[in-house]
Amino acid sequence: TFNEPVVIPEQGYLYQHHYPLVRDGKRAIQVAYHIQLASSMAVREFRKMNSPGQIGIVTNLTPAYCQDPDNTEDQNASQAVDLIFNRSFLDPSVKGEYPRELVSLLKDNSVLPSYHSEDLDLIRDNTVDFVGVNYYHPRRVRHRQAPFVSNVFMPDKYFEYYVPENCRMNISRGWEIYEKGIYDIGINLRDNYGNIPWMVTENGMGVQDEEQFMDKDGMVQDDYRITFIKDHLKWLHRAIQEGGACFGYHMWSPFDSWSWSNAYKNRYGLIRIDIAKEAKPTYKKSAQWFRQLSDQNGFTDKDGAPCK
């Protein structure tokens, strides 16, 4: 029904990165609610068609990890982040209802969306068959060290980000590389969402100036991308072995793709696009490796352990 629905209110109505470039938490909540309502309506219309197939929603899940698991304030910070950025779409889409904790949080801030009682019936009766998961990075949060000052509701009043020591970073994006997050997502869906079928619809890394990794024959030797994929697949494989219902894995992206925010600055593809020369697309090393991965339905790690 939607791809990354939370991005619209988050980036357009909270953090001013996307159109309409406003900072209004109440509008953000109303927009998010209407997106969920539209998604549920799409599910309803699909059911009316009695067509073969299934229908789902694609969510960009970012597991929230608190700095100190033994600190109640840090725990509350990560819970607030999870409620606002993950469960706000995951729960109504899969369970047909909003988390009571989220409703209380919004009510406490006087930002509950306007709604009709029949809307809630619509959401309850039209849940999805599967979930698509876009996973790139976690959120590392703690309770605020100083009060957050704003004349409108902003989720940031409940938390602040921090960077863990010795974490792996994709410096091109400023995103932490934390492959275990994909496992945690799978276990969460297994334990808290009825083990709903799901697939990884996006996973990958955008890297700037990949020309520096090009060999004399013009192939990008992107071993860093191969390592990224392997590490995530190993954790995904573990989630499946432990009963997770993941049925597929897609990369973002097959080709270097154009971004709304930075054009071709960060390259995500397994296949290189040379926009300067308008040349024929060329395989990167990762493309050859991924083809072998697909043909063999797995790979053998350096330690000889199979991942299939």
PLM features: residue spans?
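Active-site region of glycoside hydrolase catalytic domains
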Residues: 1-308
